[in-house]
């Protein structure tokens, strides 16, 4: 089985981006940066036309990339994330809580991961692949050779061993900012690592940045971290939402993509590892 999994609010209980910002401890400066982003994001979202299908909605989501690019350019220009040590980033790990059942699920996979019977990737638009990796290593039985994190990451100045304010792609062909970017990397991962049959590929995510991968993955699971994202998918004519307890569905509705739903990893473990 090949698992490709989102991080924030899929593996974690809450979004972790604010923890990265708080590590710098410049709340007023961060408020200016984040307020500007949300003003632009809300204006973009309000201008989106109504979509009745996921297929028509995904190109609209792809149009958000200019917002994310502008945001990262502002962050880099301000040097907001300059001067962070590896230790400061690693301290964030202690503040991150994982969604119920994840530790048990991933630890149950470890024997198969060690013999490459199962492969585990994290695919995220988060800005710190290091924090993602250290979180998983800290909370679970995973070792660095058993996972691969595809995300953005802070660039380090080798002369000071601190961040230089730039954000780069890690294990990705370019920065990961939106649903379209994640689809690109999803396809690359599958092409490289898919085992025996494409039906062995599972994608798990929770938000619109995951919708593209949820559409194309042979097995797709929506983590119900936010009701509004479930509601968005439920209105699409080409989507069939099914509780994970019904996996595998014996008869799909023609023309509809099955997306399984759950609220924790206990349900996923029961469906796949029981």
Curated annotation (Swiss-Prot):
The record's section on Gene3D superfamilies has:
HAD superfamily/HAD-like (3.40.50.1000)
Q: Where in the cell is it found?
A: Cytoplasm; Nucleus
| Subcellular location, principal | cytoplasm
One GO molecular function term? hydrolase activity
| This protein's GO CC annotations | cytosol; nucleus
| The organism's place on the tree of life at top rank | Eukaryota
Q: Which UniProt keywords apply?
A: Cytoplasm, Nucleus
Q: Does the keyword Thylakoid apply?
A: no
What protein family does this chain belong to? Belongs to the CTO1 family.
What is the name of this protein?
CTO1 family protein C17G9.12c
**Source organism (scientific name):** Schizosaccharomyces pombe (strain 972 / ATCC 24843)
Give the organism's phylogenetic lineage: Eukaryota, Fungi, Dikarya, Ascomycota, Taphrinomycotina
């Amino acid at each position: 089985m090949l698992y490709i999994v989102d991080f924030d609010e899929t593996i974690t209980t809450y979004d972790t981006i604010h923890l990265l910002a708080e590590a710098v401890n410049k709340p007023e400066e961060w408020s200016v940066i984040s307020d500007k982003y949300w003003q632009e994001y809300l204006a973009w979202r309000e201008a989106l036309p109504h979509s009745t299908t996921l297929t028509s909605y995904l190109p609209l989501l792809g149009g958000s990339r200019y917002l994310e690019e502008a945001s990262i350019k502002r962050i880099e220009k301000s040097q907001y994330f300059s001067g962070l040590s590896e230790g400061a980033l690693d301290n964030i790990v202690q503040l991150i809580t994982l969604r119920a059942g994840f530790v048990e699920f991933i630890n149950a996979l470890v024997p198969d991961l060690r013999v490459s019977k199962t492969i585990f990737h994290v695919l995220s638009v988060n800005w710190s692949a290091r924090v993602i990796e250290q979180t998983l290593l800290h909370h679970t039985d995973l070792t660095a050779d058993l996972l691969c994190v595809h995300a953005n990451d802070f660039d380090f100045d080798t002369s000071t061993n601190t961040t230089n304010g730039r954000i780069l792609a890690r294990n990705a062909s370019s920065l990961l900012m939106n649903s379209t970017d994640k689809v690109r990397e999803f396809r690359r991962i599958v092409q490289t690592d898919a085992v025996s049959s494409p039906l062995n590929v599972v994608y798990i995510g929770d938000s619109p940045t995951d919708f593209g991968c949820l559409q194309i993955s042979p097995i797709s699971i929506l983590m119900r971290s936010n009701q509004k994202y479930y509601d968005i998918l439920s209105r699409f004519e080409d989507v069939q939402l099914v509780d994970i307890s019904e996996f595998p569905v014996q008869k799909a509705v023609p023309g509809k993509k099955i997306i399984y739903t759950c609220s924790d990893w206990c349900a996923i473990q029961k469906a796949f590892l029981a």
